[in-house]
């Protein structure tokens, strides 16, 4: 979807995944 692609925020997505990876790493 073009509209959704326009609203895409790479930095926000990266930060979100970074937090998830950190939490996942901490669990292990």
Curated annotation (Swiss-Prot):
Q: Which InterPro entries match?
A: Calycin (IPR012674), Lipocalin_CS (IPR022272)
Instruction: Identify the tissues in which this protein is expressed.
Output: Nasal mucosa.
- Which biological process annotations from GO are given for this protein? sensory perception of smell
Indicate where this protein resides in the cell: Secreted, Extracellular space
From what superkingdom does this record's organism come? Eukaryota
**What is the predominant subcellular site recorded for this chain?**
secreted
Q: Does the keyword NAD apply?
A: no
Cellular component, GO, one term: extracellular region
Q: Which UniProt keywords apply?
A: Olfaction, Secreted, Sensory transduction, Transport
UniProt keyword annotation of NADP present: no
Record's function text: This soluble protein may play a specific role in odor discrimination and perception.
Query: What family is it from?
Result: Belongs to the calycin superfamily. Lipocalin family.
| Protein name per its UniProtKB record | Odorant-binding protein 1
Organism equals Hystrix cristata (North African crested porcupine)
């Amino acid at each position: 979807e073009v509209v959704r692609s326009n609203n895409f925020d790479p930095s926000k997505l990266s930060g979100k995944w970074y937090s998830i990876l950190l939490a996942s790493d901490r669990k292990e």
